[in-house]
Swiss-Prot record:
GO biological process, one term: spermidine biosynthetic process
Every PABS domain range: 17-254
Protein source organism: Datura stramonium
PANTHER family associated with the record: SPERMIDINE SYNTHASE (PTHR11558:SF11), SPERMIDINE/SPERMINE SYNTHASE (PTHR11558)
PROSITE patterns: PABS_1, PABS_2
Pfam families for the chain: Spermine_synt_N, Spermine_synth
UniProt xrefs under SUPFAM superfamilies: S-adenosyl-L-methionine-dependent methyltransferases
Name of the featured protein: Spermidine synthase 1
Pathway connected to this protein: Amine and polyamine biosynthesis; spermidine biosynthesis; spermidine from putrescine: step 1/1
Length: 308
């Protein structure tokens, strides 16, 4: 693994020396900056540039291709919500597939559910896994669960070999729809996910920001309504270091036993047996679960129009 060196990163701002600035065509005309105390790692995998730095205010930060993936301070808001929104909406999930999520945070959260017997994870970039284990052990702790089976490879290709109806839940923890994650936002991928789910199975996928990406969200909603014949919903949460400070999730179910995503029936926050090894939940609870489906009027109009 390539270690940090004194070579200046292209993502360290030349306008504000010593600050990391997140600049992307996905959010033109704006940037979010964090003060850098020390660059801990820089490397280039077969798929993307990887960087870790110590920030002044958010702890250690993981960057992929110039975009913040997680910080120690606020990763809980994303990891807990993308995991427990789907898993708390169905009774006794047993088989779970995670696509992406190489940092291990979703695995950490899935492992809180005692009913789960099998956790498969398919991550394309081994460097992300190795870097997360080295610099974010409290996140990557999920890999230590004996129920976890790691598959290093392309999630799209992995799904093609999954038997129909294998999983109770699929969680797609992808980066933004450019580069290696682009296929994870396209219709053929969602069709593969639906085939891999049992009747009444659920999927939760990262679905961008209502403030920045309504055009992308519209396409995702339209595709999901064509493919998933159960329930299709959009939820959101707040993550301060993500662009616009919020991130959304598509939650869908296949035809079969009805799933009411807005009313959790399998509350993980009612059982504290998992806290000894995973620590207490920092963000998720049953009340915020239901509240996350309440959308601002402008977003509600657009998303509901795609169901007509």
């Amino acid at each position: 693994m390539e270690e940090a060196n004194n070579k200046e990163s292209p993502y360290i701002s030349s306008i504000l020396p010593g600050w990391f600035s997140e600049i992307s065509p996905l959010w033109p005309g704006e940037a979010h900056s964090l003060k850098v105390e020390k660059i801990l790692f820089q490397g280039k995998s077969d798929y993307q540039n990887v960087m870790v730095f110590q920030s002044s205010t958010y702890g250690k930060v993981l960057i992929l291709d110039g975009v913040i993936q997680l910080t120690e301070r606020d990763e809980c808001a994303y990891q807990e919500m993308i995991t427990h929104l789907p898993l708390c909406s169905i009774p006794n999930p047993k088989k779970v597939l995670v696509i992406g999520g190489g940092d291990g945070g979703v695995l950490r959260e899935v492992s809180r559910h005692s009913s789960v017997e099998q956790i498969d994870i398919c991550e394309i970039d081994k460097m992300v896994i190795d870097v997360s284990k080295q610099f974010f052990p409290n996140v990557a702790i999920g890999y230590e669960d004996p129920r976890v089976k790691l598959h290093v490879g392309d999630g799209v290709a992995f799904l093609k070999f999954v038997a129909e109806g294998t999983y109770d839940a699929v969680i797609v923890d992808s980066s933004d729809p450019i580069g290696p994650a682009q296929e994870l936002f396209e219709k053929p991928f969602f069709e593969s996910v639906a085939r891999a789910l049992r009747p009444g199975g659920v999927v939760c996928t990262q679905a961008e920001s209502i403030w920045l990406h309504m055009h992308i969200i519209e396409d995702i909603v339209a595709n999901c309504r064509q493919i998933f014949k159960g329930s299709v919903n959009y939820a959101w949460t707040t993550v301060p270091t993500y662009p616009s400070g919020v991130i959304g999730f598509m939650l869908c179910s296949t035809e079969g036993p009805a799933v009411d995503f807005k009313n959790p029936i399998n509350p993980v926050d009612a059982d504290d047996s998992h806290t000894k090894t995973r620590g207490p939940l920092k963000f998720y609870n049953s009340e915020i679960h239901s509240a996350s489906f309440c959308l601002p009027s402008f977003a509600k109009r657009v998303i509901e129009s795609k169901g007509k």
